[in-house]
Amino acid sequence: MLRVFEAFAGYGSQRLALIKANIPHEIVGISEIEGDVLLSYSAIHENLLEERNKNIKLTDDEMRDYLKNINIPLDYKTFENRADKLGGQKLKDMYIANKLNKNFGDIRSIDPKKLPDFDFFTYSFPCQDISVAGYQNGLVADSGTRSSLLWECCKIIEHKKPKYLMMENVKNLVGKNHKVNFNKFLLYLESLGYTNYWDILNARDFGIPQNRERVFCISILNPNEDFTFPQKQNLTLSMNDLLEENVSEKFYLKNNQVSDEPILQDYIYCLDSNYWKGTFLKDFLSKKRRQLVSGKVRPDGKYPARRLTPRETWRFMGVEDTNFDKASILVSNTSLYKQSGNSIVVPVLESLFKELFKSQ
């Protein structure tokens, strides 16, 4: 049984991939700070939708104290704790979710001596300060940027020495501005005895029709165990296969009959590298924004343009509708968009895990 710890867990795409790959495993703990994300994780993986109706003998202050102790939930931009702002069912949901998730909370506050043993450590650390579409503040150790949280993983890796590690982040991690820090981290892992294998994998090469390139780094502690990245697969799905047939009018742009010149295709698409969000077609045409919009082109060259629905964005990440449905009961559409954009494409992980754990 593979024992797994998910740092920067999100809604658990790694866990979904392990399940899809039929790899026996146990999640012994996670680290995640965002409240809505934790609700999604618990709804998908830990039966929160039923557990939330059970009685709790703790007072509101006792539940808040528990959350504060693991520094949850945090405002992702300011790292301000928001537990005092929770009340009623929202507070109860957050408390139950964190207990069910075995969430150790803010990675900066984790004492690795208090963590259970595990074989596999995943750490898809924040990309906002690395991404071309992000802030470009970098990931220098102790710089205080969100991407510099990568270095908080060192204490865990060094103390627990899991056999397998998996890092994931945007392609720009190995670009000219950040490659030096990426290499520095790899050298650190090598000093602990790890052998590192990294490559850039694209979602379209693993069954999902979107051009989403990400850096994956596999590190193995056993020097006698090799790793080869999975081979590319033929793409059989089209974008149309993942779109909903009947979409609410609220997803269509109000001033949507816009065109400067005809475009001779049935649909237009554009996929943001980090964050799913609707945009005006004018912005798309002027290339100011790179979000995905879709609309069937009329004969006169006009476009009834709309945003992708939250469900569609999760489909483009390889998440099944049943799991989306569980999460959507508890969190807003805005959060659902953000969660999918910050996650990892499940079929890519599935192929990678099948190769990594083929002897399991």
From Swiss-Prot:
InterPro entries: C5-MTase, C5_DNA_meth_AS, C5_MeTfrase, C5_meth_CS, SAM-dependent_MTases_sf. Keywords: DNA-binding, Methyltransferase, Restriction system, S-adenosyl-L-methionine, Transferase. Transmembrane segments: none annotated. The keyword Translocase does not apply. The keyword ATP-binding does not apply. One of its GO terms (molecular function) is DNA (cytosine-5-)-methyltransferase activity. The ScrFI restriction system has two different methylases. NCBIfam families: dcm. This is Type II methyltransferase M2.ScrFI. It comes from Lactococcus lactis subsp. cremoris. The lineage of its organism: Bacteria, Bacillati, Bacillota, Bacilli, Lactobacillales.
